[in-house]
Amino acid sequence: MEEGRPRMGVIVPGNSSPVPALSAGRSTVEGYDPKLHDPFFDGVSQQLADKGFITAAADDLITWARTGSLMWMTFGLACCAVEMMQASMPRYDLERYGFAPRASPRQSDVMIVAGTLTNKMAPALRKVYDQMPEPRYVISMGSCANGGGYYYYSYSVVRGCDRVVPVDIYVPGCPPTAEALVYGVLQLQKKIRRTGTIER
């Protein structure tokens, strides 16, 4: 370090003398609590703040980016698909949340199951779900997709798409409004931010 330049330091609770940034390992700093702050990264952040950089955990950064670029697979099976289409139109505009439709499962992060799932359609649903890359999410939209709905007692209807694929968000209603689907999308984004996706 050059002579005459002030040294940057971090004040650590329980210690009266400043600890020079980047000079000590995290475990050797007295009073270190990882839930409150990290003196090491505080020092790095202070040094990089005026240069236009910011430091964050990689998992937080990845989940933040992932929630802003969710591509959904259109899987409209019945009348709920009309509301799903309406949510994409200019009045509700799901794309402002970074939620854009894709026709290929290999380019999709989210599948919206909208409508009545029949026994004949269940294998096709599972095949499309298996083609989606990890991490993948499923939104079950409407009473029929959630639990059979009107057709619960029919011999040809699957009583909930969660018997075929794992479901992350349930959107109730018959059919649910476009606002309900938008709310479900926002809940999915919160869930992704909260849980993260990097395996430890």
UniProtKB/Swiss-Prot annotation:
Subcellular location: Cell inner membrane
GO MF: 4 iron, 4 sulfur cluster binding; iron ion binding; NADH dehydrogenase (ubiquinone) activity; NADH:ubiquinone reductase (non-electrogenic) activity; quinone binding
Main location: membrane
Cofactor(s) listed: [4Fe-4S] cluster
Keyword Metal-binding recorded: yes
Highest taxon of the lineage: Bacteria
Membrane-topology descriptor: Peripheral membrane protein
Residues that hold [4Fe-4S] cluster according to the record: C79, C80, C144, C174
GO biological process: aerobic respiration; electron transport coupled proton transport
The protein's role, per its UniProt record: NDH-1 shuttles electrons from NADH, via FMN and iron-sulfur (Fe-S) centers, to quinones in the respiratory chain. The immediate electron acceptor for the enzyme in this species is believed to be ubiquinone. Couples the redox reaction to proton translocation (for every two electrons transferred, four hydrogen ions are translocated across the cytoplasmic membrane), and thus conserves the redox energy in a proton gradient.
Description of how the protein assembles with itself and partners: NDH-1 is composed of 14 different subunits. Subunits NuoB, C, D, E, F, and G constitute the peripheral sector of the complex.
HAMAP family, A to Z: NDH1_NuoB (MF_01356)
Protein name per UniProt: NADH-quinone oxidoreductase subunit B
Gene assigned in the entry: nuoB
